Amino acid sequence: MAESGVPVLGFFIIAVLMSAQESWAIKEEHVIIQAEFYLNPDQSGEFMFDFDGDEIFHVDMAKKETVWRLEEFGRFASFEAQGALANIAVDKANLEIMTKRSNNTPITNVPPEVTVLTNSPVELGEPNVLICFIDKFSPPVVKVTWLKNGKPVTTGVSETVFLPREDHLFRKFHYLPFLPSTEDIYDCKVEHWCLDAPLLKHWEFDAPSPLPETTENVVCALGLIVGLVGIIVGTVFIIKGVRKSNAAERRGPL
């Protein structure tokens, strides 16, 4: 996907819920972001709402419906998908105008940073989830492929939409359920316009290293010494106690 950059139109409308003013200073408590963009030549777009860095919902452009990040959200609120489709149509028209005015000048591409981690501490044979976190990139176009032992995996994979950052870059999460094993290795393969070659982030089970023999010997020796000291100290106290008792018996009652 090493292609030259193309213009991307991104509109970001930010609504901030703020605390009370203190000495004319305003502190943000929560932030809601409405993010939308239209992309050429892909002819794709996105419309979503974000609350404090977490997606609330996005609009599926193909199905023309609102998709809530959590089903429960849709029980307390509603959003008409047609409104988002109308916004994207405006974005497309504005993009065409800006492209002509800029003489087809491409935007500046920013390569992604990629991290692979697990959802929870790894235990062999216990189900877990691999997370591929793609961060700080622009434009919002990436192709992500999970590899298991070098072969593509598609079963059970899922992903988020493109999530906005306050610096107008993007982030995205991809997920792969898996069963940890010492025999399997995984890679998250990321392709982006700004990369000359696909970026691979590797993950495999890393068994805890056993203690060296010298360390084990030292630990055993320390344990033995502590045990002997405890026995000696205990014996001393017992002897002192017996001597005091005998001395008291010899003196007899006053």
From Swiss-Prot:
Domain Ig-like C1-type: from-to ranges: 112-204
SUPFAM superfamilies per record: Immunoglobulin, MHC antigen-recognition domain
Residue span of region Alpha-2: 110-203
Sequence ranges on the Cytoplasmic membrane side: 240-254
Region feature (Alpha-1): 26-109
An example molecular function term from Gene Ontology annotations: MHC class II protein complex binding
Cysteines paired by S-S bonds: C132-C188
Localization in the cell: Membrane
Chloroplast listed as a keyword: no
Signal peptide: 1-25
Keyword Membrane belongs to the record: yes
Keywords, comma-separated and alphabetical: Adaptive immunity, Disulfide bond, Glycoprotein, Immunity, Isopeptide bond, Membrane, MHC II, Signal, Transmembrane, Transmembrane helix, Ubl conjugation
Connecting peptide, as annotated region: 204-216
Side of membrane Extracellular, spans: 26-216
Record-linked InterPro entries: Ig-like_dom, Ig-like_dom_sf, Ig-like_fold, Ig/MHC_CS, Ig_C1-set, MHC/Immunoglobulin, MHC_I/II-like_Ag-recog, MHC_II_a/b_N
Chief place of localization: membrane
Residues annotated as glycosylated: N103
A cellular component term, taken from the record's GO annotations: MHC class II protein complex
Topology of this chain in the membrane: Single-pass type I membrane protein
SMART domains assigned to the protein according to its UniProt record, in alphabetical order: IGc1, MHC_II_alpha
GO annotation terms (biological process): adaptive immune response; antigen processing and presentation of exogenous peptide antigen via MHC class II; peptide antigen assembly with MHC class II protein complex; positive regulation of immune response; positive regulation of T cell activation
Positions bearing the Glycyl lysine isopeptide (Lys-Gly) (interchain with G-Cter in ubiquitin) cross-link: K244
Protein family (similarity comment): Belongs to the MHC class II family.
Assembly with partners or alone: Heterodimer of an alpha chain and a beta chain.
PANTHER family the record matches: HLA CLASS II HISTOCOMPATIBILITY ANTIGEN, DR ALPHA CHAIN (PTHR19944:SF86), MHC CLASS II-RELATED (PTHR19944)
Name under which the protein is recorded: Mamu class II histocompatibility antigen, DR alpha chain
Organism listed in the record: Macaca mulatta (Rhesus macaque)
Lineage: Eukaryota, Metazoa, Chordata, Craniata, Vertebrata
